[in-house]
Amino acid sequence: MTDSVVVEGYARLRDGKKWKTRWLVLRKPSPVADCLLLLVFKDKSDKVQGNKERLSATLEELCGLEVGPWYEGVAFTLAILCLTQTTLLGFDSKEALLAWDARLRYSLGEVHRFSVGVLPGTKLESGPATLHLCNNLLALARDVPPVIVGHWNLPDLRRYGPVPNGFVFEGGTRCGYWAGVFLLASVESEQISFLFDCIVRGISPTRGPFGLRPVLPDPSTSETSSEERLNHETLELEKRLSMLSHRSSTASYCPSAGGDDRSISGSSDTSDTSHSDCSVGSRLTIWTEPTSIQPENLGNAGAKAAAQSAEKPLPSGQGGGSQPPTKPPRQLQEIGRQSSSDSGIATGSHSSYSGSFSSYTGSLDSNTGEDYGSVFSLPPHLGQDVRPCTCLNVPGHEYQIPTSLRYLYDTPRSVLQEVGGDTKDNQPPAALGPTTEPAEGDKRSPGEGHLATADGDSPNEHFRSPSESKKSSEAPSGGHPGSCCFKTIVTICAVCGGFKVS
C-alpha cells in the first residue's frame, strides 16, 4: 500500500440483496482530505495489472464508523457513516474487521463512538442510539444498518457537559433544525465531555507525538495465518515457561548431614544422572556478632562450644550409620583479623609472615614479653579454631623455611628485651658482624636482626646523638647468648590446618 492508500483487501460489498466479494481499495485524494475514495476491483490481479476499477465512489461528510453484528448472512459488518449515505462492508473473520476499523480510524483522525439512550422530551425519538464523534462533527445513529438521525457541529454548540447518569448539550441557532437541548443517558459522560473539550481546543487526545506512526494490523492476513501466528506465540510462551521452571529446579534446597538447612543443591529435575551435593552446607560460614571474650575465659568458651556440638544430634545416626563428627564452623571476624590460612596467604616465607603478622596478633602494641606468633597470643575467636598439628612428619613432604630468611621478619619492639650498654661494650669485635660506620647510613647485613629500644626508655636515651643511638640500636647476630631472645615461629599445616611451633 502506498501513502495515499488507507486500506485495501478482500471484502464483501452489498449489491442489492446479495453480497459480492471484491478487492476494495480505500484511499485519500490528498493527505489532508476529509473524504475517502472507494475503488472496487473484481480481483487483486486487476489492481496489480493496472486495469480500471469497476466501481468508484467518494465518501464525503464522514460521521464515523460502526462495527455491527451479523447481518443477512454476513458474520461481521463495518458501516462507514456519511450524512447522505452509508456504505456497508462484510468480512469473514473478526481479525480482518478489526484491522480495517483500526486503519480507517487512524486515517480519519479523532473517531469515537458511544452507546447512549435518547431521553424523551426532545426532537429526537427516544430509545437506544449510537453517538458518533468524528473530528468536529457530532452525529446520532440508530437501526441496522445504521442511519444518521441527527448531527451537529461542535463549534455551533452553546453548552455541553456531564450530568448524573447522562450527558446534555444545547445546539445554537446555527444548528438550524437541530437547535435546542438534548439529553442523553450514558455511563461515559465524563469521557464524552473530555473529548469535546479537547477537540474544541484543537487538541488530539488519541494521537502520539508528530511523526510517530503506530503499528497497525495487516488486513490481508487470512484466518489460517492468524491461527498459525497464535500457535507460534503459544509455543514461544510454553518454551519460556519451561525454561523458567528448569532454572528454578536448579536452585532447590536440601538439608545437610549435620542438619544445616543452608546447604544448596546443584541438581536438576530433568537429568537422569543428577545428584545432590549437600556437603556445601558444612563449609558455609556462620556469621556471628563480634563478642569480646577475655583471654582467661577462652577455655570456658571452648568447652561450651564443644558441649553444644556434642548435644546436637545427627540425623544419619538414627539410621544406624556412623559418620565422623562434623568440624565446627569457623567464625568470621571483622576485616583485617582473619588468619593467613583463610586469606590464602602461603606460610613459611618472609613476605607471608610480614604481611599477615598483624592479622594473627591483632595489634603489635601488646604486653611486654608476649610470645608473638603463638596460639596463646591469638585473638579469642581465632584461638578456638587453631589446634596443634596432628600430621606425621615425613621428610621431604614438609616445606622447610629457608635459613637465610628465617629471622628476617619484622619483630615487635616489645618482644625483644632491652640490651644494656655493658653488653655492647663487652662484645668482641667479631660478634658484631658486618657493622658499618654511622656515615654509611642504614646498610645492614642479611644475618642481623633489627632491634629497637623498649617502651620504657629514659628521656636521656631519646636525646642521644644519631651516632650513639644507631650504635646502641644494633644487635649482635646471635653469637652472644645473653644478647639474643628466644624466637618462636608458628606455621600452619596445609593438610589439617593445625599449628606447628619451631
Curated annotation (Swiss-Prot):
Residues 264-279, 301-316, 347-358 have a biased composition (Low complexity). PROSITE patterns: PH_DOMAIN (PS50003). This is Protein Dok-7. GO terms for biological process: neuromuscular junction development. It comes from Takifugu rubripes. The lineage of its organism: Eukaryota, Metazoa, Chordata, Craniata, Vertebrata. It is found in: Cell membrane; Synapse. Probable muscle-intrinsic activator of MUSK that plays an essential role in neuromuscular synaptogenesis. Acts in aneural activation of MUSK and subsequent acetylcholine receptor (AchR) clustering in myotubes. SUPFAM superfamilies: PH domain-like. The gene is dok7. GO terms for cellular component: plasma membrane; synapse. Disulfide bonds: none annotated.
